Each structure stands twice: as structure tokens, then as C-alpha cells.
A protein has these predicted regions:
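Bacterial Sec-dependent N-terminal signal peptides
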Residues: 1-23
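Alpha-helical transmembrane segments and their juxtamembrane interfaces
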Residues: 12-13, 171, 214
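Residues in and immediately flanking transmembrane alpha helices
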Residues: 15-16, 174, 217
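Hydrophobic alpha-helical bundle signature of multipass membrane enzymes
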Residues: 24-197, 221, 228, 239-241
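Alpha-helical transmembrane segments that form the membrane-embedded catalytic/substrate-binding core
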Residues: 161-165, 198-235
């Protein structure tokens, strides 16, 4: 277990040296209306008087404790980056191949379209519940205060970062199953970073993983997605043989 976590942390630290480029507008495989409806398949966020919310509060203070670990805090700060390019660069090392538009055009195209598609699954619930974020409720800055003003106007439930991160590792694990354990461990860590930063409650992150899984299942009903996935797998085999 210790060796496994060491490899994950090594991947995280190495990735920080990979350059991040500007995002591009891309088409999606489905519209928001065609994606799974979180209001129908997941419960509402915990009521503030519930035991579940007490757990959220406990995890918030756990996150603040984790900030005392300078290495983990630095990872959480980096993970605050919303860009697709950051996610691709961060997961390139556990994936085993540098994911860029130039080096892996088919994988890059697939990931980009998937990312913008899965983004849609959480939008309706965010607007409907408009849940207050932890740093807002406790009236103190998050670990990444430059985002606080914008985030305070955007619902906390579910975690959009977690939806992006978890769906990405699901896809990369399908392309390279041999690295699935390490990829999933990094994807899990990516979601926990949102708790450490103080941008999300634990239940936001948990819901984000479930929403990402539902969105990923929906992607597999798209012929265009399946065709591009086939190209991405072929590209990976060619690059790693």
C-alpha cells in the first residue's frame, strides 16, 4: 500500500513540470437535456441538521488539518486548476503516456470531447440546489482564495472538478487497464483535494464521482464516442508497443 501511494505521489509531483496550454471550445457527444438527470437519480445534499451534514463538517476540518502537510496542500492547490489541459497533464504520468494534442491527437480529441460532455451532468443540480460552499458557510477564505468570489456564486453540489477528474480516470483506465489502480488512486485524490481546499463538502465530492460514473455510462451509448474510443486505443497501442 505504501509503495502504491508513493507511486501516486511521484506521478503527482512529476506532472507539475508539464506545461499547461489554453483550452479550446469543443463539441459534445450529448446535450445537457440528453445527459442523466441528477435530480432523479441522486438524493439532495444533506440537510444542515442531519447526521450526514455533521460528517461533512468533520471532513471540512479534516481538510484543514491536511493543509498542514505541505506536499498534500501543494497538490490540492494545483488541483484547483479547472482547465482540461491541467487534467490531461496531471494524469499523463499515471497513464504512462504524455497526453497532448501533438503527441496523442486521437486520445486528446476523445478526452476533450468527453470532458466537455460530462461537465453537463452536474449543471442542473448545481443551479437547483445552489448549495453554499464550506468556506462561505464558515465565513473564512479557502486555501485558494482567488477563486472564492466566483465559486460563491456557483452551487457546491455536486463537485464539478470531481466530475471532470473521475470521468477522466475512468476513460484512461479503459484505454490502459494495466494502469487502472494508479489512475483511480490519483482520481480519488483529485476529488479529495476539493475538500482540502475548502471549496466543497465531502458529499459534493461523493456525488461528483457518482455523477461522473453515470455520465461515463451514457457516453458508451454514443456511436461517435465508441468510434473515437477505438481510435484512441489503437493510438495508445501504437505508441506503447
Amino acid at each position: 500500500m505504501k509503495r502504491h501511494m508513493f507511486l501516486v505521489l511521484l506521478c503527482v509531483c512529476f506532472c507539475s513540470s508539464i506545461s499547461i496550454k489554453a483550452q479550446e471550445k469543443v463539441s459534445t457527444y450529448f446535450t445537457q437535456e440528453e445527459m442523466p438527470d441528477m435530480l432523479k437519480f441522486l438524493p439532495a445534499p444533506p440537510d444542515t441538521l442531519s447526521e450526514a451534514f455533521s460528517h461533512d463538517v468533520m471532513r471540512y476540518f479534516w481538510g484543514k488539518q491536511m493543509r498542514q502537510d505541505s506536499v498534500r496542500a501543494a497538490i490540492a492547490l494545483r488541483d484547483a486548476d479547472w482547465s482540461a489541459e491541467y487534467i490531461f497533464s496531471e494524469f499523463s504520468v499515471p497513464f504512462g503516456l504524455n497526453i497532448t494534442k501533438e503527441n496523442t491527437p486521437e486520445i486528446y480529441k476523445l478526452l476533450t470531447q468527453c470532458l466537455y460532455t460530462v461537465d453537463l451532468v452536474g449543471k442542473k443540480a448545481k443551479a437547483f440546489y445552489n448549495r453554499k460552499r464550506p468556506f462561505d458557510r464558515f465565513k473564512e477564505p479557502s486555501l485558494y482564495p482567488k477563486d472564492d468570489e466566483a465559486l460563491s456564486k456557483n452551487g457546491s453540489y455536486p463537485s464539478g472538478h470531481t466530475i471532470r477528474g473521475w470521468s477522466t480516470v475512468l476513460l484512461l483506465s479503459e484505454i490502459n487497464p494495466e494502469r487502472a489502480d494508479t489512475l483511480l488512486a490519483r482520481g480519488y485524490m483529485y476529488g479529495e483535494s476539493r475538500v482540502i481546499v475548502g471549496a466543497h463538502w465531502q458529499s459534493d465530492v461523493d456525488a461528483g464521482r457518482l455523477a461522473a460514473t453515470a455520465a461515463y455510462m451514457k457516453l458508451h451509448t454514443s456511436d461517435a464516442f465508441l468510434e473515437q474510443l477505438k481510435k484512441a486505443k489503437a493510438e495508445f497501442r501504437k505508441k506503447t508497443k
